[in-house]
Amino acid sequence: MLQIGDIVVSFDVLREKFLCNLEACKGECCIEGDAGAPVELEEVEKLEEVLPAIWNELSSEARAVIDAQGVVYTDEEGDLVTSIVNNKDCVFTCYDEKGCCYCAIEKAYREGKTDFYKPVSCHLYPIRIGDYGPYKAVNYHRWDVCKAAVLLGQKEDVPVYKFLKEPLIRKFGEDWYAELEVAAEEMKKQ
């Protein structure tokens, strides 16, 4: 583990390779799992604010879930997560004509309809952030649905931290990310 300030980073974030391959996985990370995506408390209001911009993109089932329970719920572990449809799809998922799943919030952001990109936990995947008292832990999460992303990352030689540069800066800031890059370069020399 590597420590930068009060943030502890798994060496896997620096060593392992990853590059999303949406053509291969079809956005399965937004579908599979036993709960929705982790959400920070301050993101709930943003999720509610973006609803008018994405409402027509959402499935009727997703709209019904949102009407019944809201955009988030507390899962079995006590974490705030996005609401899900039929214990599977995130309520913010949409599908294109090829059956590929994508995030309606990110689509609205790219179209200039909102200034909210999507929950930071989604943006950071396959990194998961854990809280341990005064420290945050940055860990690489391995999941079978991302095998194609691992293979593409290996082929293109893209480490997890480089693939996730933008969301890591969004979460921890540019100075922190610059320190992470220095640490990664030093680690390569060893």
Predicted regions and their residues:
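Short loop/turn segments that flank or connect secondary-structure elements
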Residues: 1-190
